[in-house]
Every structure is written in structure tokens, then in C-alpha cells.
Amino acid sequence: FLKMLKKVLKKDQEIAVICLSLPGVCDQGMIDLCDFEDFQNKNILEILKKEIKQKIIIENDVNCASIGFYHQYSHYQNSALIYQPAVDYVGCGMIIQGKLYNGFSHFAGELRCLPFYNHLQQERLLKDDPQELLEKQIATLCCVLNPEAIGICSDVLKDIQISLPFL
């Protein structure tokens, strides 16, 4: 990865900022709970700073997407974006009062850690009944965050019909 990045930077010397969007908890360059095992429990920011002079931003992938969602729908100052991939775990980015919310240790939005199901049950539900999993996660967001809008990006549900009569 570093070799490829250096090659790109050598070709285009106008690049001033590098932004890495990673599937995992990213806290000031330290990566935790990452889908990329080579990055897990490593301070990627410190590793890159030793080799690269450009400014480096490292953020969770769904948080980056939620910033884009907010810019598209900026009239919603309090929003959330849920990403439901076909594999692994669901994530969520949250915008509160127009700003990305990471939580104390950048763990906010890790819906895969909600106590409804263990990881094996979540994997099974993602394959067999992704609608149920998504509805529980949406209900949780509504009860805790109460966003004005929730964007949903799902790789497994083509026709999303959310039914939450209790909210």
C-alpha cells in the first residue's frame, strides 16, 4: 500500500492531502475493529507520517459517506447514514448539528456491536432476513439519536420497505 501511495505522489506532486477512508474504528490514526486485518491495531497515521509529507486524514468509511449525505441533504442538521454491506457488518455515520459525531473514542456508529445479536447471528440475518436487522438498527438510532433523516445504503435489500409502527 505504501509503495503504491508513494508512486502516486511522485507522479502528481500537486497532491496536498491524503484521505484514507477505512472500514473500522479510526481514532487519531489508530485503527481498531478494522475489516482489513493488516491495519488492525496499528497507528496508520504514524506509519504514513514517517514516509509522507502531505497532510493525512484517516476516517471511518461510513463516516465519510455520511458527510457526503449531509452535504447532499444539508437542510437536515441531524442525520444518520446506515450502510448495510453484503458481507461483514453494518456501520452508521451520524451528523449532529451539522457536524460529524464520532463519540468519545470514535466508536459511535458501530451498529455491529449492538446487543441484539452476536456476530454469527448478525451474519445469518444479513443473509436470511436483512430487513429485520436493518429495522432494529433504525429503531435504535431513532430512540437514541432521533435524527431528522436516515439515509440507507444496502447491498442486500433492493426494495427497502421499513415498517416501524411503534415509532
Outline where the language-model segments fall.
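Glycine/GP-enriched mid-protein hinge/lid loop-to-helix segment characteristic of carbohydrate kinases
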Residues: 47, 51-143
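Glycine-rich phosphate-binding loop and adjoining helix at the ATP-binding site
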Residues: 1-78, 162-167
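Glycine-rich nucleotide phosphate-binding loop and flanking beta-alpha elements
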Residues: 26, 88, 158
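ATP-binding/phosphotransfer module of carbohydrate and carboxylate kinases, centering on a glycine-rich
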Residues: 1-16, 50-54, 116-167
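Flexible, active-site-adjacent loop/turn segments at secondary-structure boundaries
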Residues: 29, 34-37, 109-114, 154
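Short secondary-structure boundary segments
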Residues: 22, 83-86, 154-155
